[in-house]
Curated annotation (Swiss-Prot):
Originating species: Oncorhynchus mykiss
Protein name from the UniProt record: Arrestin red cell isoform 2
Subcellular location: Cytoplasm
Keywords: Cytoplasm, Sensory transduction
GO molecular function, one term: angiotensin receptor binding
Length: 405
């Protein structure tokens, strides 16, 4: 039997090791027309279960204040969405076809394992973390998704950390396959005591950029006025629309260039400036929007948010966008500036895990998918097909161990 890569499965157990949750992935992609389903398996010790039921909840929450300020029953957190699934005993009308991964896990784990399934609504925001300050402790502000599994006689029963499993997943978006048109903007400015005007034209080399990719800004100035351009300032700005009780917008420069390029009266000027917005140069900026964090992985600037219906006022959370600002500093005449919107995202991975009903797979000659279980009748040890990885969340500075998800 040749060597082959096993199927990665993330798992996390309760502190008392009586409840364990298994998931095939941690990132669930928003494709705009639908979101990847959240399907997993929960394993419960039968001696511990007794007469109780098994519940799994999916919560999307927006934390908008420091955790240490949660006093007197007041919490700076708003639950945007809560869904509950009763895994055992199963409810007939909630039963759905198991995915291939669920079928394989159920076969491996035995009769004490139970499948669960959630559908994430499309109007929920993507996972975004607001960068904490040096003195901030506890959970960072932002939007996150959490799965919680526990045993109880009813859903209203108080849940204890010792016998429940909490793990954080992410709702993410990837760059569209077809980028938009090349951004270009122009403006003309007239000045007092000057018969002629100044014309500024700016453009980007494309509309879609991947994280870490340099941005080329083409600046063309035709100065027919009597004024002189003293300096040129180029900046990349992140805009975060906080949509909760009301809508507020916060902007933060993430890359900037200032050049002493002068444009005299009755002359033209053309130059390409290059900027690369990265988190490494902005780690001290409190409140900067970042992609949601998982495990012990570093993150990056928050990806641009793509909204399917821009007129939908029910979208809550943090909506992120980016613009390049080109500013000309004029001698004794004020400033002339334009803005160019662009999209900053991760490319779509070549192979994404896909959750499909087991019944949808043909019985003969199934397509090979490295992200799914391969059913083999001649396998000596099907257990070797699994690579279990503990499910953990990036531990922020000052965060207690029991909050590590």
């Amino acid at each position: 039997m040749g060597d082959k890569a096993g199927t990665r499965v993330f798992k996390k157990s309760s502190p008392n090791c009586k409840v364990t949750v298994y998931l095939g992935k941690r990132d669930f992609v928003d494709h705009l027309d639908q979101v990847d389903p959240v399907d997993g398996v929960i394993l419960v010790d039968p001696d511990y279960l007794k007469e109780r039921k098994v519940f799994v909840t999916l919560t999307c929450a927006f934390r908008y204040g420091r955790e240490d300020l949660d006093v007197l029953g007041l919490s700076f957190r708003k639950d945007l969405y809560i869904s509950t699934f009763q895994a055992f005993p199963p409810i007939a009308e909630e039963r759905k076809a198991n995915s291939r991964l669920q079928e394989r896990l159920l076969k491996k784990l035995g009769q004490q394992a139970h499948p669960f399934y959630f559908t994430i609504p499309q109007n929920l925001p993507c996972s975004v973390t607001l960068q904490p300050g040096p003195e901030d402790t506890g959970k960072a502000c932002g939007v996150d998704f959490e799965i919680r599994a526990f045993c109880a006689k009813s859903i209203e029963e108080k849940i204890h950390k010792r016998n429940s499993v909490r793990l954080v997943i992410r709702k993410v978006q990837y760059a569209p396959e077809k980028p938009g048109p090349q951004p270009m903007v122009e403006t003309t400015r007239s000045f007092l005591m000057s018969d002629r005007s100044l014309h500024l034209e700016a453009s980007l080399d494309k509309e879609l950029y991947y994280h870490g990719e340099p941005i080329s800004v083409n600046v063309h100035v035709t100065n027919n006025s009597t004024k002189t351009v003293k300096r040129v300032k180029i900046s990349v700005r992140q805009y975060a629309d906080i949509c909760l009780f009301s809508t507020a917008q916060y902007k933060c420069p993430v890359a900037q260039v200032e050049a002493d390029d002068q444009v005299s009266s009755s002359s033209t000027f053309c130059k390409v400036y290059t900027l690369t917005p990265t988190l490494d140069k902005n780690r001290e900026k409190r409140g900067l929007a970042l992609d949601g964090k998982l495990k012990h992985e570093d993150t990056n600037l928050a990806s641009s948010t793509i909204v399917k219906d821009v007129t939908n006022k029910e979208v809550l959370g943090i909506l992120v966008s980016y613009r390049v600002k080109v500013k000309l500093v004029i001698s004794r005449g004020g400033d002339v500036s334009v803005e160019l919107p662009f999209v900053l995202m991760h490319p779509k991975p070549t192979e994404l895990p896909i959750s499909r009903p087991h019944s949808a797979v043909p019985e003969s000659d199934p397509p090979i998918d490295t992200n799914l279980i391969e059913f083999e009748s001649n396998s000596f040890s099907q257990d070797d097909d699994f690579v279990f990885e503990d499910f953990a969340r990036l531990r922020l500075k000052g965060m207690a161990d029991d909050e590590d998800c």
